[in-house]
From Swiss-Prot:
The keyword Transcription does not apply. One of its GO terms (cellular component) is cytosol. The gene is purM. It comes from Nitratidesulfovibrio vulgaris (strain DSM 19637 / Miyazaki F) (Desulfovibrio vulgaris). HAMAP family: AIRS (MF_00741). This is Phosphoribosylformylglycinamidine cyclo-ligase. Belongs to the AIR synthase family. It catalyses: 2-formamido-N(1)-(5-O-phospho-beta-D-ribosyl)acetamidine + ATP = 5-amino-1-(5-phospho-beta-D-ribosyl)imidazole + ADP + phosphate + H(+).
Length: 350
């Protein structure tokens, strides 16, 4: 846009030229995420996607939307913006993965008070990397510059994912039975939940981003900005050869709120807390925040980012498959009969 035509809008705090510069910067990055289903280019009013429905009897679309929450405050504080886009993708694709869906495409929304092209390009590069890890296309997005809506240097993110699953292969937990095995797959850290408390604990500790995290060989900034794991490749590999009865993306609400979402009312989950390795960041939060492990499991993933529930006769094979894909997995519990409907549906043995 010519300077004369855009001057009034620029004077009002919206720099259209900066927006155009951002599109030019990210165009090739976004294009590299495109899969065979993408039939439109960046810059159109809508993204076009033609799904491959071969082999599907009753294709069902599955959608999810999410954000990154106050983990963004850590990005602002530590001046590192290239990984929160991965978090954004992970939060939505892992959610639809729970129902057995294959992610098709992703849309992002980036909002800020004053557009910093370098920062925005760094964020969108992370979104593209997340899409690459999830084998889905970054089909489109929106960049909103809104003066006076955000503090200087801050922004917010939202993401939207659409995936596909055959109706006969939807994973909904209805086939879970007493005796089934619960497999936990390692998280990379806090993922994208519990950061309001984590940041409060950090402020009280007196540590800064460059300090080593107690019990770890990494800095505070590195640990707190470690991106959320994307479990698409692992889960799809397991689904090709084994029946998964139920899955859980361990997000806000931890074990106690998320596991019951996939359990039939007649059963409960028995979790053995000592069955997996808890990363140092959670031990630090426990001690520094003066918390208990039940409180921790209500807030954080505590080292388990994703759960699969399978028949006991395939548990060892599934564990072998996951571990062979350079991820850590453990049998962390089993399904029992629910004897008291007034009690928690997740019972943890500490």
């Amino acid at each position: 846009m010519s300077e004369d035509r855009s001057k009034a809008y620029t004077d009002a705090g919206v720099d259209i030229n900066a927006g155009n510069a951002l599109v030019s910067r990210i165009k090739s990055i976004v294009a590299r995420t495109h899969t065979n289903g993408v039939i439109s280019d960046i810059g159109g009013f809508g993204g076009l996607f033609k799904p491959d429905l071969a082999g599907m009897d009753e294709p069902v679309l599955v959608s999810s939307t999410d954000g990154v929450g106050t983990k963004l405050k850590c990005a602002f504080q530590f001046g590192k913006h290239d990984t929160v886009g991965i978090d954004l993708v992970a939060m939505s694709v892992n959610d639809i993965l729970v129902q057995g869906a294959r992610p098709l495409f992703f849309l992002d929304y980036f909002a800020t008070g004053k557009l910093d092209v370098d920062v925005a390009a760094s964020v969108i590069s992370g979104v593209a990397e997340g899409c690459r890890r999830a084998s889905c296309a970054l089909l489109g997005g929106e960049t909103a510059e809104m003066p006076e809506m955000y503090a200087p240097g801050e922004y917010d993110l939202a993401g939207f994912c659409v995936g596909l699953v055959d109706n006969t292969r939807i994973v909904d937990g209805s086939s879970i039975r007493v005796g089934d095995s619960i497999i936990g797959i390692a998280s990379t850290g806090l993922h994208s939940n519990g950061y309001s408390l984590a940041r409060k604990v950090l402020a009280q500790s007196g540590l800064n981003g460059n300090d080593p995290l107690p019990g770890s060989d990494r800095t505070v900034a590195e640990v707190l900005l470690e991106p959320t794991a994307i479990y698409v490749d692992i889960v799809r590999s397991v689904m090709r050869d084994f029946a998964i009865k139920g899955m859980v993306h361990v997000t806000g609400g931890g074990f106690y709120d998320n596991i019951p979402r996939v359990l039939p009312a007649t059963v409960e989950a028995h979790i053995d807390f000592g069955s997996w390795t808890v990363p140092p960041v959670f031990n630090w939060l426990l001690a520094q925040g003066n918390l208990t492990w039940p409180e921790m499991l209500q807030i954080f993933n505590c080292g388990i980012g994703y759960i699969m529930i399978v028949s006991p006769d395939v548990c060892d094979e599934v564990l072998g498959r996951v571990n062979a894909m350079h991820a850590q997995a453990w049998r962390i519990g089993s399904i029992g009969r629910r004897r008291d409907k007034a009690a928690e549906q997740v019972q943890v043995a500490f």
